[in-house]
């Protein structure tokens, strides 16, 4: 089986030559040279674990390159290696320029890839620190790294990191339960993707008084596909927090049932769906369509029955 670093693009180089090659590559004063379009705003470290497949790694690497076109970044990709047994490291260098509608919209980015032995935490942190752009904020994206391993990085690799990132819809563990040194500096991509959903739900429900939304509420049911398990968990947490005031208006609010259901067959039609059930016959339903960037609200909350479309992606 190939190591992940061999599945990603880039030029093989000795680890010690990467920074020198970078300097030579961008060293030009000409106004039309690539260096004129290279102005990094941040460092982004993409950190893979053992069980990440080549396809998953390529997908996330491509996503990060797309991100770097909008927000120029120095990308560092950490790839665990099964072939390295002596503590040594491997390196690759990837660079590419993207041209927009005009030459002025050109953007150049770089990615430094490192193959390493996972047990070598200290040396890994040292090498990453050498590759980081100084004086720029750093973001660390964990992808498939076990929680126990992440904890080992807390006092070396994660020192000085502005934000640690993970995707709960991908991870096999709930990393929100990890003993992070600064939980406020940790972000879940699944929660970030929910922003337009929360905006759509909030905009619609704000047209009703809180008392009316709370009275006779029997259950809140959230159904999700396997691929959107993180969104399901984060959305029900948000709803539970929003409806926490219900006990002020209805003494039975503490009896409201919050139910999360994994729905395999939902994948093809509605991979994420929400329903409020009321004992008096009222209801509120929202669902995300499997294709496209739209969802739909269907409700009967005391006024006339309503059915409207909602945008669920920016």
Please report, for each region that a protein language model flagged, where it lies by residue:
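Short, flexible beta-strand-to-coil junctions
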Residues: 49-51, 225, 277-281
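A contiguous, surface-oriented mixed alpha/beta subdomain in the mid-to-C-terminal portion of proteins
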Residues: 169-172, 176-263
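Internal, hydrophobic cores of structured domains that mediate oligomerization or house catalytic pockets
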Residues: 94-101, 105-206
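Structural alpha-beta junctions
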Residues: 65-77, 132-139, 158-165, 240-255
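C-terminal structured domains
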Residues: 21-32, 40-42, 61-64, 71, ...
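An N-terminal, globular interaction/scaffold subdomain
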Residues: 1-140
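Short secondary-structure transition/capping segments
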Residues: 88, 151-153, 260
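Flexible loop/turn segments at secondary-structure boundaries
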Residues: 85, 147-148, 229-230
């Amino acid at each position: 089986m190939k190591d992940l670093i061999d599945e990603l693009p880039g030029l093989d180089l000795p680890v010690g030559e990467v920074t020198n090659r970078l300097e030579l590559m961008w060293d030009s004063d000409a106004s039309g040279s690539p260096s004129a379009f290279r102005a990094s705003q941040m460092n982004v470290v993409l950190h893979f674990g053992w069980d990440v497949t080549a396809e998953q790694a390529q997908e996330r690497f491509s996503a990060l390159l797309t991100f770097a076109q909008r927000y120029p970044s120095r990308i560092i990709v950490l790839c665990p290696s099964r072939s390295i047994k002596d503590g040594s490291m491997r390196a690759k260098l990837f660079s590419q320029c993207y041209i927009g509608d005009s030459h002025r919209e050109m953007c150049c980015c770089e990615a430094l890839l490192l193959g390493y032995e996972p047990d070598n935490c200290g040396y890994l942190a040292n090498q990453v620190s050498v590759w980081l752009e100084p004086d720029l904020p750093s973001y660390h994206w964990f992808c498939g790294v076990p929680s126990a391993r992440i904890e080992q990085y807390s006092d070396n690799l994660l020192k000085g990191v502005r934000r640690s990132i993970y995707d709960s819809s991908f991870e096999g563990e709930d990393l929100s339960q990890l003993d992070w040194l600064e939980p406020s500096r940790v972000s879940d991509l699944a929660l970030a993707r929910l922003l337009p959903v929360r905006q759509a739900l909030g905009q619609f429900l704000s047209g009703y008084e809180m008392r009316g939304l709370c009275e006779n509420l029997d259950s809140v049911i959230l159904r999700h596909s396997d691929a959107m398990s993180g969104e399901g968990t984060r959305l029900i947490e948000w709803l539970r927090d929003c409806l926490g005031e219900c006990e002020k208006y209805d003494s039975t609010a503490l009896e409201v049932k919050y139910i999360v259901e994994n729905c395999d067959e939902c994948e093809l039609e509605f991979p994420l769906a929400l329903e409020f059930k009321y004992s008096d016959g009222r209801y509120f339903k929202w669902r995300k369509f499997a294709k496209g960037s739209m969802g739909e609200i269907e409700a009967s909350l005391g006024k006339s029955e309503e059915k409207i479309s909602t945008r669920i992606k920016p």
